[in-house]
Amino acid sequence: MRRGLLLLNLGTPNNADIRAVKLYLREFLTDKRVIDLPTIPRYILVYCLILPFRSPKSAQAYQSIWTEKGSPLLYHSQNLVTKLQSALKDEYKIALGMRYGTPSITTALAELKDCHSLTILPLFPQYSSAATGSAIEKTLSHLANQEIIPSIKIIRDFYQRPEYIQAQAKIMKPYIKDNFHLLFSYHGIPERHIHKSGCDTLCPQTCTPIYDKNQACYRAQCYQTSLLLAKELQLGTHQYTTAFQSRLGKTPWIKPYTDEIFAELISKGIKNIVVSCPSFVADCLETLEEIGIRAKEQWEKLGGEQFILTPCMNDHPEWIKAIQSIVNEQF
């Protein structure tokens, strides 16, 4: 009998019009792990304040990156599945499930129903409750309703895996130039999520090395990712910076903020930067529009000169090999 491999990602609207984007945002933002408020305040916030104002802006942003093939996140993910299935041959049956939108986790699990074992791989290198935790919870809730539950292995995170670091670094390396500063921009999360992960206090600068207490700290995992990538790329500490993007609302999110770090870099005389987004394995709204368009415009307005965004791993052969190694090690 075949093994099943379930790849999980966040999701994308079905198209870039306001209605589709609003439906997607509604499903996304009402998730209790994303906005961790009690149900009634969460729904009031989402339905009365966020959706009416954010949906048109988000639709416009999606339209700026939408292609003839549709959503970049979706087609990169589908290409990944196709190439990974070819590489793994009959050893695994692979399905893609999106936490929000389509293809759904329910649909993906139906494709894998005849597999005697199931490896669940959320495509988030660093663990966060809002992304990884939510995707795993949704998957397990569906599996709980099956008559026959397969043997299950969950790969919670892989930020420290040499295969991931080496693949990411090889894809980045052609874009790294001697007179450029490297900015690692990770998706941010609210500070309170860090406290809920077991960290009593937030580290003032870089997080301390990973140990038992902060092993589930998203910020610590991101800083460790930067450290490992810089080492693989043979960069000194003065040659790169770590920051966090995509904050929403007025509550404090983990710092430093990507959009605020630009002025600091300019003040240091840095004019040319390369930006990489290691928390995203596939190019999407947050990389292509937020960084590739808006952040680039901000950099140029501040007096910056060259701005290079490295592509995500998408369906790159090095990423395919990395997943093969990570998954096969489970057995």
Swiss-Prot record:
Fe cation binds at H187, E286. It comes from the Bacteria. The keyword S-adenosyl-L-methionine does not apply. Keywords: Cytoplasm, Heme biosynthesis, Iron, Lyase, Metal-binding, Porphyrin biosynthesis. One of its GO terms (cellular component) is cytoplasm. Its EC number is 4.98.1.1. The keyword Lyase applies. InterPro entries: Ferrochelatase (IPR001015), Ferrochelatase_C (IPR033644), Ferrochelatase_N (IPR033659). Disulfide bonds: none annotated. GO terms for molecular function: ferrochelatase activity; metal ion binding. It is an enzyme of class 4 (lyase). GO terms for biological process: heme biosynthetic process. It catalyses: heme b + 2 H(+) = protoporphyrin IX + Fe(2+). Pfam families: Ferrochelatase. SUPFAM superfamilies: Chelatase (SSF53800). It is found in: Cytoplasm. Pathway: Porphyrin-containing compound metabolism; protoheme biosynthesis; protoheme from protoporphyrin-IX: step 1/1. Belongs to the ferrochelatase family. HAMAP family: Ferrochelatase. Catalyzes the ferrous insertion into protoporphyrin IX. This is Ferrochelatase. It comes from Legionella pneumophila subsp. pneumophila (strain Philadelphia 1 / ATCC 33152 / DSM 7513).
